[in-house]
Amino acid sequence: MALRSPQYIFGDFSPDEFNQFFVTPRASVELPPYGGTVLCGAQAADDLPDGHDYQRIEFGVNEVIEPSDTLPRTPNYSISSTLNPQAPEFILSCTTSKKLPDDIDKEVNYSSANCQYPGPALALDGGSPAEAEALENDGVSGGLGQRERKKKKKRPPGYYSYLKDGGEGGPSAEALVNGHAGPAVSNSVGAEDTDLMGDVPTAGTPRTWGSPQDATDFVSDAGPAGAFPGALDGGARTAGQLEGCPGADSEASCLPAEAGRDTLLRTAVAQPSVGTDTTENLGVTNGQILESLGEGTAANGVELHTVESSDSDPAKAESAPPPADAPASAAGTVPASQPAKSWASLFHDSKPSSSSLPVVSVETKYSPPATSPLVSEKQAEVKEGLVPVSEDPVAIKIAELLENVTLIHKPVSLQPRGLINKGNWCYINATLQALVACPPMYHLMKLIPLYSKVQRPCTSTPMIDSFVRLMNEFTNMPVPPKPRQALGDKIVRDIRPGAAFEPTYIYRLLTVIKSSLSEKGRQEDAEEYLGFILNGLHEEMLNLKKLLSPNNDKLTISNGPKSHSVNEDEQEEPGEGSEDEWEQVGPRNKTSVTRQADFVQTPITGIFGGHIRSVVYQQSSKESATLQPFFTLQLDIQSDKIRTVQDALESLVARESVQGYTTKTRQEVEISRRVTLEKLPPVLVLHLKRFVYEKTGGCQKLIKNIEYPVDLEISKELLSPGVKNKNFKCHRTYRLFAVVYHHGSSATGGHYTTDVFQIGLNGWLRIDDQTVKVVSQQQVVRPAAERTAYLLYYRRVDLL
């Protein structure tokens, strides 16, 4: 007895018929009883998901691939074994049965990314499930039903329903998927259907014949493999398959077709879940990120603009309006007057024609993002917010506070924080870390209230405001853990630095106050920046003092000379002579005259301000002395004899001869000059002058090791004669608390880092921009080839 097995008979087709009906990668012929979709074409098996094996039959070849009996039969696949491409309903433009809106939820419509052809709907699986089940049972059993069916002309499921129910007014189809047409849907979709609109994954879908291979033509290849969890979950499905939405993990809902909407964009590129807080990424095309525009259209001429925000709200993205240059018909319905196309014409070329819906190829013209106006706007806000102290209502409060302030030198244990350097700001970051480690500077800024933009929209003290904000970035450090014993006798201390931040408000001060440091091409110098800070804070505090004493002439910001004589009988008229020229004392044997520049005290001068006395000795004349203020003490280290900081200090006060000086009578005289320390500040900053300017205009760096102690004692010989016996040893002894290093051998480049003493750790920290690590005291004072000490910060020990 012959074994009754399913037989599949295919007719002889001419080459033209074969090319029309069977040459397409997206066409699928589903054969019973195996239920596996047979994909045709060279690209069919390339993009299948893992774990799925599909039977492949190639037409027009001599060898027939025998099917495997182990292919499972699942009800998830609909069977269409009576496909006859020569049926008249597939060649002529027949209409489908009219669907009601209630049928939307029963069927799944897929908008093919490469088969968007308007025209009559072509439903290949319009038959009822009962009819399909009967056909499947007949095919399996091979009984009488199958023999009777062989005698009949093969008709597709639902063929007679076309003749019975087909009529005018049938909706036009949107697309064919795998050679099948989905149910037509009215253009008006309710709110419930809109909420159900989701994504149709295509990561594992075979590419259509003639579809663009490059990702720049379309974004279907942009996502990584496995990026779309719903891609081909259970293998290939026909358009008429009834299947629920993907699982909760993918959070994608079934997508009903809606003409004229952005369904193609959603089909080609799967969107992430709605619950994310980050920007929705659709894919990368030519290095740009195409962002989801929610309900935006994908019509012709609509561009996908790059959205730069990384914390955009998805709800805002859904409500974003379409671009202004989008045509009005983009979000409307499909034009009704479309040329009718035959079923066979769909397989000639999947590239859209000029008359087809312009949703296959989305124009992604790259528009470079505009320069972020964040910095410029903030900078403009600060400039516009600058007002005179007389127009600043908060200025009088700060002035009264600074007038009665008492400097606090008590050490404070702050949690260290690195400073992010996104530009060439290392010389600023290094200086800021040293100032934060200065206790009186920290306490002074913490005494001034921190005002918000709402509380103080206009300011007359931008530098004070910025440093008050900087000091408030640092908080008290938690109690440090006990030192733990490491290998050997070394003590290892742990440090927990806070999060690094970028002090952009400090950087903007360079342009707001129009400092010369902001000029392009200038050497970035940490000592010059320190002077810029201290002088700027000092001048703002002087302006605040004017509010309390508006008629006080001494508060003028001037370095003009003021004559002061020890012997009032010999006092000269004020304003006679100039501070810049040598003043010759009268021939009578009287006490020398000391000339002093106006230097009004502020809290900044109370911390960093000192005085040096410059005395000029002239033959046959008495001494002429001038008092000059300083914030940093300049130490010349160019001589080969200078190896330590003490050597540089002694060289500073050494008597030097001045050649070529002439009097008013054009007579050359021999003079000499000596500098001594008149007043020592609580915080002494020593500047090792490593950058030497040549006569040709160039600049070179002195790379030599200068030894500096942790405890520095200022010798009595360095002091002025009038203050030698007034300063006790405790007033002349300092302790190192910060070192600013310069790295590199070039005077016009390099890098800056800082070592600071941490009182809570009772040790040293090395801060390189945002990097913070613990170092030993020996590492701080030990010379190194890669770095040289540039600024030394000392505190008086009697104030510790």
Swiss-Prot record:
The keyword NAD does not apply. It is an enzyme of class 3 (hydrolase). Residues 306-316 have a biased composition (Basic and acidic residues). PROSITE patterns: USP_1, USP_2, USP_3. It catalyses: Thiol-dependent hydrolysis of ester, thioester, amide, peptide and isopeptide bonds formed by the C-terminal Gly of ubiquitin (a 76-residue protein attached to proteins as an intracellular targeting signal). One of its GO terms (cellular component) is nucleus. Residues 568-583 have a biased composition (Acidic residues). The modification N-acetylalanine is found at A2. Its EC number is 3.4.19.12. Residues 132-159, 306-335, 555-596 are annotated as: Disordered. It comes from the Eukaryota. Keywords: Acetylation, Autophagy, Cytoplasm, DNA damage, DNA repair, Endosome, Hydrolase, Nucleus, Phosphoprotein, Protease, Thiol protease, Ubl conjugation, Ubl conjugation pathway. Residues 555-564 have a biased composition (Polar residues). Residues 326-335 have a biased composition (Low complexity). Specifically inhibited by spautin-1 (specific and potent autophagy inhibitor-1), a derivative of MBCQ that binds to USP10 and inhibits deubiquitinase activity. Regulated by PIK3C3/VPS34-containing complexes. The modification Phosphothreonine is found at T24. It is found in: Cytoplasm; Nucleus; Early endosome. Its main location: cytoplasm. Phosphorylated by ATM following DNA damage, leading to stabilization and translocation it to the nucleus. Ubiquitinated. Deubiquitinated by USP13. Residues 6-21 are annotated as: G3BP1-binding. Residues 2-100 are annotated as: Interaction with p53/TP53. The modification Phosphoserine is found at S211, S337, S367, S372, S549, S565, S578. Hydrolase that can remove conjugated ubiquitin from target proteins such as p53/TP53, RPS2/us5, RPS3/us3, RPS10/eS10, BECN1, SNX3 and CFTR. Acts as an essential regulator of p53/TP53 stability: in unstressed cells, specifically deubiquitinates p53/TP53 in the cytoplasm, leading to counteract MDM2 action and stabilize p53/TP53. Following DNA damage, translocates to the nucleus and deubiquitinates p53/TP53, leading to regulate the p53/TP53-dependent DNA damage response. Found in a deubiquitination complex with TANK, USP10 and ZC3H12A; this complex inhibits genotoxic stress- or interleukin-1-beta (IL1B)-mediated NF-kappa-B activation by promoting IKBKG or TRAF6 deubiquitination. Interacts with IKBKG; this interaction increases in response to DNA damage. Interacts with TANK; this interaction increases in response to DNA damage. Interacts with TRAF6; this interaction increases in response to DNA damage. Interacts with ZC3H12A; this interaction increases in response to DNA damage. Belongs to the peptidase C19 family. USP10 subfamily. This is Ubiquitin carboxyl-terminal hydrolase 10. It comes from Bos taurus (Bovine). The gene is USP10.
